[in-house]
Amino acid sequence: MYETYHSGWIECITGSMFSGKSEELIRRLRRGIYAKQKVVVFKPAIDDRYHKEKVVSHNGNAIEAINISKASEIMTHNLTNVDVIGIDEVQFFDDEIVSIVEKLSADGHRVIVAGLDMDFRGEPFEPMPKLMAVSEQVTKLQAVCAVCGSSSSRTQRLINGKPAKIDDPIILVGANESYEPRCRAHHIVAPSDNNKEEL
């Protein structure tokens, strides 16, 4: 006979901006609350677009959250009786978040992370690829391309209405004033100014 062990697991919600990641995170967390589970939510301090102490979707749905500056702060909280741990905008944390999430799940918690899988250049946005690899469940959501209306898997960064340059900083917190969803065909990354001088 096999022994069974009580262990947690990791759920990963990912996709482009405006694909409903935070909305899906909030939905899953609210289901946990409805089931009388103890739920704790964390979000990075850098994300202050809508509210400092709430995870807020672009549609305005919200859930209370603990604002943290770095991933290690999660472990300073007493999570002994917590059933479900939610972490939004996980791409804003360093790689330490991966080992923390794995420890939390090994300790019996259901851990739900949400964040971008690609940066504005269409390249993997660490640490999300690593989190996807260690997750028991991965949900990849798509938005609607702002240009053609097809499914979008990419996030277009716009600076004054023009595509961002490839050498622009990876992190720029913003919403629809700086970003829009795009399909592969309509996703544009402008060359750096240095490349123009070399041509």
Curated annotation (Swiss-Prot):
UniProt cross-references to InterPro entries, sorted A to Z: P-loop_NTPase (IPR027417), Thymidine_kinase (IPR001267), Thymidine_kinase_CS (IPR020633)
Biological process according to GO: DNA biosynthetic process; thymidine metabolic process
Keyword Phosphoprotein attached: no
Entry binding sites for ATP: 15-22, 88-91
EC number: 2.7.1.21
Record GO terms (molecular function): ATP binding; thymidine kinase activity; zinc ion binding
Amino-acid positions noted as binding Zn(2+) in the UniProt annotation, renumbered to this chain: 145, 148, 183, 186
Swiss-Prot/TrEMBL catalytic activity: thymidine + ATP = dTMP + ADP + H(+)
GO cellular component: cytosol
Catalytic residues of the enzyme: 89
EC class (word): transferase
Protein localization: Cytoplasm
Keywords annotated in UniProt: ATP-binding, Cytoplasm, DNA synthesis, Kinase, Metal-binding, Nucleotide-binding, Transferase, Zinc
Highest taxon in the source lineage: Bacteria
Keyword Cell cycle part of the UniProt annotation: no
Pfam family, one: TK
Entry-linked HAMAP family: Thymidine_kinase (MF_00124)
Similarity-based family: Belongs to the thymidine kinase family.
Subunit and partners: Homotetramer.
Entries under PANTHER family matching the protein: THYMIDINE KINASE, THYMIDINE KINASE, CYTOSOLIC
Protein name: Thymidine kinase
Species this chain originates from: Staphylococcus aureus (strain Mu50 / ATCC 700699)
Gene name of the record: tdk
